[in-house]
Amino acid sequence: MKRRGQVLIVVAVLIPVLLLFLAVAVDAGRIFIDRASLQRSAQAAADAGISVVAEHMVTLAVARQTIMASTPSPTPPGTMTATPVLSNIQAWLNDEDRQALTADPLRGTAVAEAIHYAQRNGVDPSQPEILRLEIHYPQAGYDPGDPSIHALRILVEIERRTTVLLAGLLGESFMDLEAAGQSEIPQR
């Protein structure tokens, strides 16, 4: 009985199986890396957009603090409301300030900054593999006068088409990946 022929058949059967496992491992690794990169890009864009809002929020609070500091304070009759701590920025804001934080000029600036940071992280909407880049600010249902809403949120959603090796052998050479990043800032 010759074993050489049996070994050759076993090797011939195992090589395609081994190559299939290798292709699956390479595809899974590539998808994992692309998805993580997309997630980091979405989160960086959301953080950049909310930083514009935070900067404007501080500007509004400092203006209000300056007004309070320059106003003479005689002893008024009745009870007084406590002055907020200087570091508690959101306590200095009123509903008009909260409305200014979601007005069109600031909304446009926040969205533009989020898009800029998405582009800096490799997500350029003009690239054909970027299927979708959506920025939602403020969150749905936000009302500046509603005291039950404690935070302003920005949500960045990205969808990118990526190439896969094994799926190409099976007829599908692309896969769509989605990621979302959300940042928020307290406003009450």
Where are these regions (language model features)?
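C-terminal juxtamembrane segment of a hydrophobic transmembrane alpha-helix
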Residues: 15-32
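Charged/polar positions on well-ordered alpha helices
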Residues: 7, 44-51, 116, 120, ...
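Short, conserved structural patches
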Residues: 55-188
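N-terminal alpha-helical signal peptides/signal-anchor transmembrane segments
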Residues: 28, 32, 41, 45-57
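Juxtamembrane extracytosolic/periplasmic "stalk" immediately C-terminal to the first targeting helix
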Residues: 37-44, 66
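Glycine-centered recognition micro-motifs in short, flexible terminal segments and loops
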Residues: 1-16
